[in-house]
Design a protein with these regions (language model features):
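Surface-exposed patches in mature extracellular/periplasmic domains of secreted proteins
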Residues: 129-135, 200, 225-227
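N-terminal export/targeting leaders of redox proteins
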Residues: 1-46, 221-261
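Short acidic, glycine/Ser/Thr-rich loop/turn "cap" segments at secondary-structure junctions
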Residues: 102-107, 131-138
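Extracytoplasmic electron-transfer domains, predominantly the class I c-type cytochrome c fold
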Residues: 77-126, 169-223
């Protein structure tokens, strides 16, 4: 999982093991921790053997036989189950081209179950947070999420979530993509994939839940009360169209007046 990759900022195939408010032993079949906003879980230990076999097949060539890292891929020991789940479920890993500056989102090569199995194996090497999140969106405040998004996310992903170019040939991916799930949004915020900031201590679980609700709600399913969203790229396109119509209208009026005189 290349360190220079910019990931965007994914709910797929995760079973809820409970809503424990405090951390329990990591890696166990019922290990959970979290809050009323987000519960973090770990795949059961029974997944580890299958996960190890998958890791050797799809991951070890870049990350090493024991996930210790190589010149082709970073050390994965201690990254947490949530990190592994994000990269695999978004299709960024296994990488088709390890030399790419940025691994793009693509259809996942491994199933959600297989992602959990690999996450269980990697987490067993050095149990760590974050776990795999279950987001309780029914309690979210979408208005607060919109404000938090504008303060913490819009600088890279733009205020409309359409994504934008960054330095060194990388980009912040679009969050308008309906394939981006609430689970992946939380995982990205909590793990900071590639050079995305890790908001582990800056945002509470409730704030992350609110941002997630906004992204998977209004950004991915806009109401467009104006009728036409002009590609959803924000006020620049809207201003340009308004200017074009306004100037064009004035030109026609001026031509009409001049023709009459």
């Amino acid at each position: 999982m290349p360190g220079a990759v910019v990931a965007g900022v994914t709910l797929g195939g995760v079973l809820a093991f409970g809503m424990g408010a405090n951390a329990q032993s990591l890696g166990g079949p019922n290990a959970t921790y979290g809050t009323a906003a987000i519960t973090y879980t770990y795949p059961p230990d029974s997944y580890i053997p299958a996960g190890q076999a998958l890791f050797q097949t799809f991951c070890a060539s870049c990350h090493g036989a024991n996930a210790e890292g190589t010149s082709r891929g970073p050390n994965l020991v201690g990254v947490g189950a949530g990190t592994v789940d994000f990269w695999i479920t978004t299709g960024r890993m296994p990488a088709e081209n390890p030399n790419q500056i940025q691994a793009p989102r693509k259809p996942a090569r491994l199933s959600n179950q297989e992602a959990l199995e690999v996450a269980a194996y990697v987490n067993s090497l050095d149990p760590a947070r974050p776990g795999i999140p279950i987001v309780h969106l029914k309690t979210a405040n979408v208005a607060d999420g919109a404000n938090l998004f504008s303060l913490n996310c819009a600088a890279c992903h733009t205020i409309t979530g359409s994504g934008d170019a960054l330095a060194y040939g990388t980009n912040a991916p679009s969050l308008q993509n309906k394939q981006v799930t609430s689970q992946q949004v939380v995982e990205a915020i909590r793990t900071g994939p590639a050079n995305m900031p890790r908001f582990s201590g800056n945002l509470s679980d409730a704030q992350v839940r609110d941002i997630t609700s906004y992204v998977t709600g209004r950004l991915q399913h806009p109401t467009n009360p104006g009728g036409f969203d002009l590609g959803g790229v924000g006020p620049v396109a809207e201003g340009f169209v308004a200017l074009l119509i306004g100037v064009g209208g004035l030109a026609l009026v001026a031509f009409w007046i001049g023709d009459r005189s």
